[in-house]
Amino acid sequence: MNQITPTYRWARRAQDTVAPAVTATAHGNAIQLGGGYGFPDTLPDIVAEAVAAAEAKAETLQYGPLYGLDDLRDTIVAYLAQDGIVAARENILVVNGAKHGLDLACRVFLEPGDAVIVAAPTYLTAVHILKDAEASFLSIPQDEEGMDTALLRRRLEERRDNGGPMPKLLFDVPDFHNPTGITMSAARRRDLVALAEEFDFVIVEDDPYRRIRFEGEP
């Protein structure tokens, strides 16, 4: 039997040592600060949910709609409206978490070698996904207001003036940033939107923590 040598992309994934380390500390009495683990008492009653699901097995044990359950998509539309985002059910695609969503965004918007704007530092798992997409990085430092948008503008202008490759995508966690904990100011958010319109790149926002706060408005 011939020995099969893994492709270089698979070989790079196989060297990932982050998942075992996180998994090893995700249980027991340890408080895991390296991932978005919820407080156990706030988790849903999975036994009650399982009983309800069994009673509705004709619906729950079949394939669901391709873009997600209609009721869920409508709920997401209403949730977005709280932040002034106008959307319709047809604009919503339900995915299996942020990692799945970011991977899909990379497949849609990026070609190997394309530049992606990220904060320095940025979410470690996002780095792995972007590397798998063979993206290059334009890393922008942060201060207490989040990503330095003035510096980002200068970097973008330099690339444009020198005929360099322009970024196609920006990834950030603007609320309680992982790993810094910084929340981006409203002024910086407006700056980012203006830059995206001027320099024609897509903003991918990872926003799991926006409404989990002890003080202030989201």
Placement of each model-derived feature along the sequence:
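Intrinsic-disorder/low-complexity coil detector
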Residues: 5, 19, 43, 164-166
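N-terminal small-domain helix-loop-helix segment of the aminotransferase-like
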Residues: 10-97, 104
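Glycine-centered flexible beta-alpha turn that most often forms the glycine-rich phosphate-binding loop
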Residues: 206
